[in-house]
Amino acid sequence: VTSTKWPVKDDFIFSASMKINNYFLNDQVSFGLMVRDDMYIDKVTPDILGDYVAAAPLLLTHENAPANCFARKSGKLVYGGTCTRGYKPGETVKVQIESTSDGYACTFGDETTITGGFDFKLTALDPENVYLCMFAARNADVTFSDVRLDIK
């Protein structure tokens, strides 16, 4: 995980190209961009901490219909929608998270931009900042390029 602390009052567009090099097929593998309300690095805890939105697929075992973006709000996982197809190693996709007046808009590849269910500001744990991240979880190998953080 690579992250940047960002003032919550400053609207942004966070985007990148992401090459999917390889991944182990299970429902917890994911990769993309994330915005969180707090960041935990090298912290061991049994608690599920923090809320987030992710411009990323999930449930990759659902071959042609993985989840299109996801979020965690008040400890509950929320799926943004369903992808129109599966994503395979060797593909390069665009990913983007844009702050909006009431939350975030997440886009993964050519899929529909997700805003519904992502209408919260991520200020529960840190009311001043959010944390913008690039991530690959659970045996995923991706390469990010053309990473941009634009102020709106």
Please state what every model-predicted region is.
Residues 1-6, 80-86, 120-122, 133-134:
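Beta-strand-rich interaction surfaces with strong enrichment in secreted/lumenal proteins
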Residues 41-43, 78-81, 112-118:
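Surface-exposed loop/edge segments in extracytoplasmic proteins
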Residues 14-16, 90-99, 104-108:
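Short tryptophan-centered beta-strand motifs in secreted/extracellular beta-sheet-rich domains
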Residues 1-70:
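Secretory/extracellular carbohydrate-interaction modules
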Residues 65-67, 77, 104-105:
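Hydrophobic residues embedded in beta-strands of well-ordered beta-sheets
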Residues 117-143:
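Flexible glycan-contacting loops in extracellular carbohydrate-active proteins
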Residues 72-94:
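Short, aromatic/His-centered strand-loop micro-motif at the edge of beta-sheets
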